[in-house]
Amino acid sequence: MVSSVSLFASLTPYLVSALLLFLLLEQLFYRVKKRNLPGPLFVFPIIGNVVALIRDPTSFWDKQSAMADTSVGLSVNYLIGKFIIYIKDAELSNKVLSNIRPDAFQLTGHPFGKKLFGDHSLIFMFGEDHKSVRRQVAPNFTRKPLSAYSSLQQIVILRHLRQWEESFSSGSRPVSMRQLIRELNLETSQTVFVGPYLDKEVKKTICDDYSLLTLGTMAIPIDLPGFTFGEARQAVSRLVNTMSVCVGKSKAKMAAGENPTCLVDFWTHSIIEENPPPPHSKDKEISCVLVDFMFASQDASTSSLLWAVVMLESEPEVLRRVREDVARFWSSESNELITADQLAEMKYTRAVAREVLRYRPPASMIPHVAVSDFRLTESYTIPKGTIVFPSLFDASFQGFTEPDRFDPDRFSETRQEDEVFKRNFLTFGNGSHQCVGQRYAMNHLVLFIAMFSSMFDFKRVRSDGCDDIVHIPTMSPKDGCTVFLSSRLVTSP
């Protein structure tokens, strides 16, 4: 015992010296990578500024954005041993988004996304693997499948709107829309993607697991039992297993010659027609992509639908024009669904949806990791291993006419700012990893705006900071969009 204490005492100076050397080198390497870019002069050892990020994500990123204004549109920081760069300038963001390849950048979706979502996630693929999966996925978002999805979307949306009528339309008490919309979106994505293969109990399990996954994206990445991040990883594993069962059932159904009724059916139907099957078409590989899709459609769509309600309530003239636009084609009394042609003709409502996505893009930024040194500007080269955050939010307020104003007419056929400032509208990303389901997401938002605004009057419960942005993990209003709801019509379908 004495000898052990003596040994430890003799080693203590060396251990302390090694620790001090490590801390010194950590600060030195940070300063070398930082160069002359704005950011903290010194960072907290090992963990960096991750506590500030988790405590108040909005404030953290606002400060990074403000610092970027003092340079060429870049600022830096340090998170759990990772040097990070925040990109505010839209052109520099495009440069990152269009260079996802083995010698430049890899999309991560989250600073610790690969550990959370797993190796088979579409998020982390590039090169031929990514092209192969995209070739399989893209046909599932063309006109015929989208038309089938639209009917499913509307059935679910109307079911939830009727439930809201029964529960809240008296207008006697306010309701926070966030949880209502989240439940609507989760059922919609389950129904559209794998609907026939889920029973009530499995749907509940999926809902719980996605809640854990959402919490995991905002937690300190400690992958141990009892920690939120570790529980989120386990939730992802369960979701992949659940989706794998659905894929297997779909393949059997399509092999029997039945018609596709949901996204996984359209996908497996095309796989069965190929001989031999294409790469990355095993049950687990497809299920990993479905988990990605459902996660994106749930949280991103919850954000966009929430902000749609916020903006429609605060812009009475926009709401009036939406109702007028929709009334030309659809009424909640008609007992009919909106057709694909009618949806395409709701041009003002579609412009409102695009402006919601510009004004409040659900994912404010998309993390990438530099897989090699990359020269971003004439004066700065991004070091290998850096996590880069191109800001889709900041890009949306560059170039556009009066960008701080909510103005759907900017997307009219006359002004066409979506084409004029195409490189600034990055809500769905850019380059090879641009969102493959963007037409589906846009249709979902347009359908919700059309039906919700036609069936309800709604009045916001205003409070200090209610419109402030919070990241949970996508952008949402701080109050969860609390409103009084009341029915516009005596009857509904």
UniProtKB/Swiss-Prot annotation:
Induction: Not induced by pathogen infection. The keyword Endoplasmic reticulum does not apply. Pathway: Steroid biosynthesis; sterol biosynthesis. It is found in: Membrane. It comes from the Eukaryota. Very weak expression in roots and root hairs. Not detected in the root tips. It catalyses: 5-dehydroepisterol + NADPH + O2 + H(+) = ergosta-5,7,22,24(28)-tetraen-3beta-ol + NADP(+) + 2 H2O. Its cofactor is heme. One of its GO terms (cellular component) is membrane. Heme binds at C435. Pfam families: p450. Keywords: Heme, Iron, Lipid biosynthesis, Lipid metabolism, Membrane, Metal-binding, Monooxygenase, NADP, Oxidoreductase, Steroid biosynthesis, Steroid metabolism, Sterol biosynthesis, Sterol metabolism, Transmembrane, Transmembrane helix. GO terms for molecular function: C-22 sterol desaturase (NADPH) activity; heme binding; iron ion binding; monooxygenase activity. The chain crosses the membrane at residues 5-25. One of its GO terms (biological process) is sterol biosynthetic process. InterPro entries: Cyt_P450, Cyt_P450_CS, Cyt_P450_E_grp-I, Cyt_P450_sf. It is a single-pass membrane protein. Its EC number is 1.14.19.41. Belongs to the cytochrome P450 family. Plants overexpressing CYP710A4 show higher levels of stigmasterol and lower levels of beta-sitosterol than the wild-type. This is Cytochrome P450 710A4. It comes from Arabidopsis thaliana (Mouse-ear cress). The lineage of its organism: Eukaryota, Viridiplantae, Streptophyta, Embryophyta, Tracheophyta.
